[in-house]
């Protein structure tokens, strides 16, 4: 019975991990797009403060999701990905 429960738990963790990785990937893409928008706004001489504030809030949310992803990876005994910017 315990082996079946562990197997089900692992399957559930795998599913959560997959969904979380999709959220993280999408969030990173949106941040890159927003950075492009901010750059274009600067070139046009527009006020970028609201857009930068939005990016800051989005980065905080992304950090939370990355933490969830890392927790799930550790629970599954997997290697953590390199930190952002460590390419």
Give residue ranges: language-model regions.
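Anionic, Ser/Thr-rich low-complexity intrinsically disordered regions
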Residues: 1-87
